[in-house]
Amino acid sequence: LVSGNATEQAWIDGIKAASDQMRNKTIDRPKLVRLMALYFFITYAALTITFYAAFLVDGYHLPKTFSGVLISLFFLAIMAPGLILDRIIGIFKGYTNVAAIAMIGAGLFCFGIFRDRGMLVVGASLAGFGYGLMQPLIYDKTAIIAPPRAATLALSFVMAVNYLAIMLCPFLIDTFTRLTALHGDRVPFLLNGMLTAGLALLAFRRRDDFTLGLDASYYKR
């Protein structure tokens, strides 16, 4: 009976999601732009690790191969949330995005503050896990705001900003350091850690927002 009720509820949730999608005659552009902006920022912030970990490791006089280990752990952590996504959402519920953004920020601060190898491993894992947690949620929301015939187009726009962030990340950080005369291997991590902390605070205050929050349909069964 319990299994039957769970199956029925999952079916009802699927019907609701489909009806939300069918109500859209065109792509909801304001929501799409906000999702693109959010995806751009978290990609830009998280990729600080892939671009600048090697410089930090070298500055800390750690083995050069350790930066490769950190980057590998970062991408491994991105994959991990997808394996237990429902459980994670069940734990954090409407605060899922807040928690994910906070993880990215905490990971960056681990790089910017600590010199210990263990904390750098924790930082790479936290940042990757938080980023990997937000990715599927952004993709799912993107599909919802477009009619079925335009869902692929909407997703292509969101995916495009992912690659745009990859391309612009080092240029944006280098431009900031030149303009502010702030230098050092820790600066990129501290800068983006502070920006991410600000976004986490905004997500907490706007946790009922479509972009920064998470609808109850994701975790109510």
Indicate where each model-derived feature is located.
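A membrane-interface helix-boundary motif in multi-pass transporters
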Residues: I173-T196
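Extracytoplasmic gate region of multi-pass secondary transporters
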Residues: K31-S72
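Multi-pass alpha-helical transporter architecture, strongest
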Residues: P188-R221
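Helix-to-loop junctions at the C-terminal end of transmembrane segments
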Residues: A80-K93, T177-R178
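A late C-terminal transmembrane helix in Major Facilitator Superfamily
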Residues: I145-A181
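Transmembrane alpha-helical segments of major facilitator superfamily
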Residues: V69-I78, N162
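C-terminal transmembrane helical hairpin of 12-TM major facilitator-type secondary transporters
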Residues: G94-I138
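Flexible cytoplasmic inter-helical loops of multi-pass small-molecule transporters
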Residues: L1-R23, T211-K220
